[in-house]
């Protein structure tokens, strides 16, 4: 099973308000349509929040339940997110990819931002039907915080216990995880993240330079590190050319930053997991 997250920085104008880049969505849809025989039943798609997921909570004070939000606005994150998921589903359908959108607050409950209970069985049915499951972040209900904003970067971890994930690819608006020189001008790509260097690489990551409330590159890398210690390969790479998707999914050493797992997925059992990062 492969999971690809296409960043909101690619599929929307991230500094706007609910401003989709329909042409980019269509290009990804058409590429996946061409490869559908190979991908159907093996691929889960996640779309980033972009100017939906990161702008709506600011407009309606829903970034955090401690803010003065209004009850009549509680629905707005989910309504707008599902508008975005529906648009993606519609474009994929027009291009010949059968999709099914999942609304995240309907199947996940968190406690202090961490997923506590979630129901993945319907996703397995969608995959068995050779339909592409499509996910996004959302406002989700939280036992200790009332609600929280759940990033699309954290969706892949919901599948790891139930499915044998091979690789999770995150396509975004930079080449991968970059290291900046001291005056912040020169930057070089970090090609590989391992059990040995992940602490140092994490120090290079930070928030997004665009409108973003979920932690930018840092949250992305942390999510992929937790997956690495469950035996899942991770890739962070540029998706400004949608043609980069297939090599990112299938090449042994894809462009961008490769996060090499430090347990063997094939033999992985709970007790085997060598957790040095966070699970
Ligand atoms: N070390 C780093 N290397 C590369 N980018 C970094 C680094 N640290 C922070 N960033 C920022 O992280 C951004 C990518 O994260 P961001 O969450 O904005 O992307 P996305 O996943 O495409 O969007 P969305 O979260 O809306 O889906 C980059 O554009 C950059 O501004
Ligand atoms: C999508 C929501 C609700 C939050 C933001 O999501 P992300 O930009 O995909 O991390």
Regions found by a protein language model. Give the residues of each.
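C-terminal catalytic "cap/lid" subdomain
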Residues: 1-279
């Amino acid at each position: 099973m492969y999971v690809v997250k296409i960043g909101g920085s690619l599929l929307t104008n991230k500094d706007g308000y609910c401003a989709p880049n329909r042409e980019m969505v269509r290009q990804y849809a058409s590429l996946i349509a061409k490869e559908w025989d190979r991908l159907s039943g093996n691929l889960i798609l996640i779309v980033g929040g972009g100017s939906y997921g990161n702008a709506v909570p600011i407009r309606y004070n829903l970034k955090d339940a401690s803010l003065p939000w209004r009850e009549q606005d509680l629905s707005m994150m989910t309504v707008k997110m599902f508008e975005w998921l529906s648009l993606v589903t519609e474009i994929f359908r027009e291009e010949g990819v059968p999709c099914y959108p999942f609304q995240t607050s309907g199947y996940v409950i968190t406690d202090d931002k961490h997923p506590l209970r979630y129901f993945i069985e319907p996703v397995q049915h969608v995959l068995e039907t050779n339909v592409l499951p499509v996910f996004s972040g959302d406002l989700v209900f939280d036992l200790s915080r009332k609600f929280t904003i759940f990033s699309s970067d954290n969706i892949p971890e919901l599948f790891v216990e139930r499915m044998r994930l091979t690789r999770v690819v995150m396509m975004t608006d930079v080449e991968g995880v970059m290291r900046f020189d001291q005056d912040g001008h020169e930057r070089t790509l970090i090609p590989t993240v391992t059990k040995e260097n992940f602490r140092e690489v994490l120090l290079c990551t930070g928030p997004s330079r665009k409108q973003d409330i979920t932690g930018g590159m840092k949250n992305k890398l942390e999510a992929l590190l937790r997956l690495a210690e469950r035996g899942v390969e991770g890739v962070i790479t540029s998706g400004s050319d949608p043609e980069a998707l297939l090599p990112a999914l299938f090449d042994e050493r894809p462009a961008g930053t490769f996060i090499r797992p430090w347990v063997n997925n094939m033999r992985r059992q709970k007790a085997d997991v060598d957790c040095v990062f966070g699970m």
